[in-house]
Swiss-Prot record:
Residue ranges, Cytoplasmic side: 1-63, 319-350
Name used for this protein in its record: Proton-activated chloride channel
Classification via InterPro entries: TMEM206
Location relative to the cell: Cell membrane
Function: Chloride channel gated by pH that facilitates the entry of chloride ions into cells upon exposure to extracellular acidic pH.
Keywords: Cell membrane, Chloride, Chloride channel, Ion channel, Ion transport, Membrane, Transmembrane, Transmembrane helix, Transport
Membrane topology: Multi-pass membrane protein
Pfam families xrefs: TMEM206 (PF15122)
Catalytic activity: chloride(in) = chloride(out)
A cellular component term, taken from the record's GO annotations: cell surface
Signal peptide, first to last residue: none
GO BP annotation list: chloride transport
Gene for this chain: pacc1
Keyword set includes tRNA-binding: no
């Protein structure tokens, strides 16, 4: 019995030793509990602060991005306005300054041109058509020869002076350009009081039009007013190579112009004792090439392309404006949401 009592008293003493520190220092235990609670609360507050900072940085980035989008819209609007102005300016310039278009039409046979010669006191000795650029040697220069050309004589009043009567010899020109047809004419002038001797001539587009004209005098006056005249001198053989140029005017009418290249070679006179004032004239008319040059003014400004470009520019402007409007609304919405969340956090803290 005595041994059992000693064992019970020892166990009781050990139990008292374990509970005495808590009983002796109740404030320390309370501080330990507060520290544990604080340690449990502090991580939650730190996580909230980090989340708030991340959300704030995202919001700032979104706002900056939206502002940049607005600036991009303004830049696009400026570029679009400049494009509209430049397009309208270019369209007006193209209307005022059309572009010249040159094309070439190939033909095998030309309409026979008319050759109007003004020999004055000179006399036609011969006129023949030859092919393939071949002119036979002169048999008896200065004497009348073979005349196989179709000719017409006409007299009319000079359209510039209205007082001088002009006498013209109209000759049908070459037609077959593929076989290089040419017309060779020889004139003789026995005496002259002038220091220089030459024969005038002009070219017009159609000999048939002259024949079919009801008023040939008026026709020749119009030709002299419209076409330039040239000369060929005595003592030489003048080779005239013609080319035809057709120009389409703005009113739709068509004008015809002859361009020519001439080459002159000296005539070696082998006649015995020719008269001092005796002059021989030789002239050749031939087509240069089988191409008719056609010229017309083309307005490159296309109103439909300008309208399409303007519509595209305005469509881009409207799309950009709509995008900018949505961006502003989104910025306002994000700002309001941020303010509401901040107010809620402040209320929670308070």
């Amino acid at each position: 019995m005595e041994a059992i009592r000693k064992e019970l008293s020892r166990s009781y003493q050990e139990l008292n030793d374990e509970t005495d520190p808590i009983a002796r220092d109740p404030e320390g235990a309370q501080e330990e509990e507060q520290e544990e609670a604080a340690s449990a609360v502090v991580p939650d507050r730190d996580s909230d602060r980090s989340n708030t900072r991340v959300h704030f940085s995202r919001t700032c980035l979104k706002n900056v991005f939206s502002v940049l989008l607005i600036f991009v819209y303004l830049l696009l609007m400026g570029v679009a306005v400049f494009l509209v102005y430049q397009t309208i300016t270019d369209f007006r310039d193209k209307l005022k300054h059309p572009v010249m278009s040159v094309s070439y039409k190939e033909v095998n046979v030309y309409d026979a041109p008319g050759i109007a010669l003004y020999p004055g006191k000179a006399r036609l000795l011969s006129c023949k058509h030859h092919l393939y650029d071949h002119i036979p040697p002169l048999i008896d220069p200065g004497q009348p020869g073979e005349n196989t050309c179709i000719t017409q004589n006409i007299s009319y009043t000079d359209p510039y002076t209205n007082s001088t009567v002009k006498h013209a010899l109209i000759v049908q020109g070459p037609r077959d350009v593929r076989r290089r047809e040419l017309v060779f004419l020889q004139f003789h002038l026995n005496e002259t009081k002038q220091d220089f001797s030459a024969i005038d001539y002009l070219l017009f587009s159609s000999y048939d039009a002259f024949l079919k004209s009801t008023n040939r005098v008026r026709f020749m006056q119009d030709c002299e007013s419209s076409f330039s005249s040239w000369k060929f001198s005595g003592g030489f053989r003048t080779w005239v190579k013609m080319s035809l140029v057709k120009t389409k005017e703005e009113d739709g009418s068509q004008s015809v112009e002859f361009r020519q290249e001439t080459s002159v070679v000296n005539f070696i006179d082998r006649r015995e004792n020719p008269d001092k004032g005796d002059q021989l004239f030789f002239v050749v008319f031939e087509w240069k090439d089988p191409y008719i040059q056609e010229i017309q003014d083309i307005i490159t400004a296309n109103p439909w392309s300008m309208i399409a470009l303007l519509c595209s520019v305005f469509l881009v402007l409207f799309k950009a404006a709509d995008f900018a409007k949505l961006s502003v609304k989104w910025m306002i919405k994000v700002r309001r949401r941020h303010l509401k969340k901040r107010t809620r956090e402040l209320n929670h803290i308070s």
